[in-house]
């Protein structure tokens, strides 16, 4: 076994996954305190946790009821390990139910709570040190604890929740009914930090330098003297993977840059110049644009697009790998956010990702995914720690399927050109305005909608381009960027004047959720 958590000299807090779509945020928040944290299945045993040797355990929230026939449980011996445990929402209910307390099912006694609620602290607790006696928290539960297990005492309540926080300090067990990992819990970060630092005794000394050392050791142990093939997409993720792999295994790495005809303007030449020339990666450039575009002709469904691109991407790799000797591994830039949006054992699929579930079952490679425990902002920090320049590290995120998922409906050469050119204008103007670090991600979309316009003295019937610009910290949630009107106006004027077959620009003002970042 070669997981990071096997490296016993690194303190870590393990988050057990009970299905909340935001459970990765718990690990993300803990990492902000300089403590390594990762998710594990709720099926993990007490002995497996002993082997990992964490300094703390968090039981995440989840959509289930502890009374459901298929409810996710826990190995009860975990509570006897002597390791501090924090149960969040479902996690608190699971502690209560397992240790002999009482949880009331949804619909009884009006215990449902959704949205911000006022938490009132009733007794002092190390978990809430430095926070006010009354504070806003995000509640999202139907079931509720009405009797706490023996040895526990009440810490806090709310108007509709008689036990919103409880603890057993002797056994170092803590439960909170709200979600501290989301920003709507005003002092949530303080609570998680108290758990990690004060209760678990974390040193707070984990950093990207630690990650580099751990991941290099993991890669070398996994790969040995075998060879790795990496697909470069031109985005930040695959570029960082390439530099990390080269640092770990040197010339055992061969990179294939597949030009599928769906790249941004001048992307291919920039990738070769930067990663091939400046960083010395061994890159094979493959022009497979006709191959991809022929397969995508007439395809409108976004999931079919993703699957076609994911499958064909690996088949191109097969073709190129057959020309090489002894290639056993395919490396990908899969992130934590890719994994959760593609669905896990405990969470439903939001959409498939080209890096997760979009690969053919008969693929001849083993997978290496060095970034699959990181969020996007952490990948940028990793790139900086690896010595990569800002123009690479802060490059706009770009999905593996490329512009295919920024074109609604069928992909045509005309639509591709509208997105490619409008996106270049958008990126240029955002940079000129000095907003390229403030806006987390920005791109254009061909909506597939045509509308009537007037240009010169003639009537037009051309495409509508949508601008998507968001602010975010980790990609799990996002708000639309409130760009200055003068910047939006300049972008709009330039696009309709400089890009053929476009006569209307709209601005996407939807947050995530309910929308995802990409349109498809």
Swiss-Prot record:
CDD domains xrefs: GATase1_GMP_Synthase, GMP_synthase_C
In the UniProt record, which is one GO cellular component term? cytosol
Q: In which pathway does it act?
A: Purine metabolism; GMP biosynthesis; GMP from XMP (L-Gln route): step 1/1
| Domain spans labelled GMPS ATP-PPase | 206-395
| InterPro entries given in the database record | Class_I_gatase-like, GATASE, GMP_synth_C, GMP_synth_GATase, GMP_synthase, GMPS_ATP_PPase_dom, NAD/GMP_synthase, Rossmann-like_a/b/a_fold
Residue intervals of the Glutamine amidotransferase type-1 domain = 12-205
List of residues binding ATP: 233-239
Enzyme Commission number(s): 6.3.5.2
Question: Pfam families from the entry?
Answer: GATase, GMP_synt_C, NAD_synthase
GO MF annotations, alphabetized: ATP binding; GMP synthase activity
Keyword tags: ATP-binding, Glutamine amidotransferase, GMP biosynthesis, Ligase, Nucleotide-binding, Purine biosynthesis
Q: Which PANTHER family match?
A: GMP SYNTHASE [GLUTAMINE-HYDROLYZING] (PTHR11922:SF2), GMP SYNTHASE-RELATED (PTHR11922)
Name the HAMAP family for this protein. GMP_synthase
Task: Describe the subunit structure.
Answer: Homodimer.
Protein name per Swiss-Prot or TrEMBL: GMP synthase [glutamine-hydrolyzing]
Task: Report which gene this protein is encoded by.
Answer: guaA
């Amino acid at each position: 076994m070669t997981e990071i958590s096997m490296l016993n000299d690194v303190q870590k807090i393990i988050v057990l996954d009970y299905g909340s779509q935001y459970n990765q945020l718990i690990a993300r928040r803990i990492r902000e305190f300089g403590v390594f944290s990762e998710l594990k299945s709720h099926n993990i045993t007490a002995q497996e946790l002993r082997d990992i040797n964490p300094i703390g355990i968090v039981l995440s929230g989840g959509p289930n009821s502890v009374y459901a026939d298929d409810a996710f449980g826990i190995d009860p011996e975990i509570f006897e390990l002597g390791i501090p445990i924090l149960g969040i929402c479902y996690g608190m209910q699971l502690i209560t139910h397992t240790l002999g307390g009482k949880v009331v099912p949804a619909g009884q006694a009006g215990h449902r709570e959704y949205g911000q609620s006022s938490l009132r602290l009733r007794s002092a607790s190390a978990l809430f040190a430095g926070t006010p006696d009354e504070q806003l928290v995000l509640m999202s539960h139907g079931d509720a604890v009405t009797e706490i297990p023996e040895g526990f005492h009440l810490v806090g309540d709310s108007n509709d929740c008689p036990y919103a926080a409880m603890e057993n300090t002797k056994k170092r067990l803590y439960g909170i009914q709200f979600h501290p990992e989301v920003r709507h819990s005003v002092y949530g970060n303080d609570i998680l930090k108290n758990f990690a630092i004060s209760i678990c005794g974390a040193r707070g000394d984990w950093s990207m330098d630690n990650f580099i050392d751990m991941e290099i050791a993991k890669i070398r142990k996994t790969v040995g003297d075998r060879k790795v093939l990496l697909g470069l997409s031109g985005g930040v993720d695959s570029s960082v993977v390439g530099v990390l792999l080269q640092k770990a295994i040197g010339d055992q790495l061969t990179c294939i840059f597949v030009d599928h005809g769906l790249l941004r303007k001048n992307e291919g030449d920039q990738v070769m110049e930067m990663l091939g020339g400046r960083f010395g990666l061994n890159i094979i450039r493959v022009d497979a644009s006709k191959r991809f575009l022929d397969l995508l002709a007439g395809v409108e469904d976004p999931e079919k697009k993703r699957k076609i691109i994911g499958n064909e991407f690996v088949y191109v790799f097969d073709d190129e790998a057959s020309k090489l000797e002894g290639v056993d591994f395919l490396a990908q830039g899969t992130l934590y956010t890719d994994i959760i949006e593609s669905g896990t054992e405990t969470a439903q699929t939001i959409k498939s990702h080209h890096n997760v579930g979009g690969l053919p079952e008969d693929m001849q490679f083993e997978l290496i995914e060095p970034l699959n425990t990181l969020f996007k902002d952490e990948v940028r920090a990793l790139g900086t720690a690896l010595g990569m320049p800002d123009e690479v590290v802060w490059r706009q995120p770009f999905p593996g399927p490329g512009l295919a998922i920024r074109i609604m409906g069928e992909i045509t050469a005309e639509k591709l050109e509208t997105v490619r050119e409008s996106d270049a204008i958008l990126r240029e103007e955002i940079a000129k305005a000095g907003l390229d670090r403030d806006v987390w991600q920005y791109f254009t979309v061909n909506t597939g909608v045509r509308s009537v316009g007037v240009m010169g003295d003639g009537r037009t019937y051309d495409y509508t381009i949508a601008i998507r610009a968001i602010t975010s910290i980790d990609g799990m949630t996002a708000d639309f960027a409130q760009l200055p009107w003068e910047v939006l106006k300049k972008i709009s004027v330039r696009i309709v004047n400089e890009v053929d077959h476009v006569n209307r620009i709209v601005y996407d003002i939807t947050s995530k959720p309910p929308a995802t970042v990409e349109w498809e």
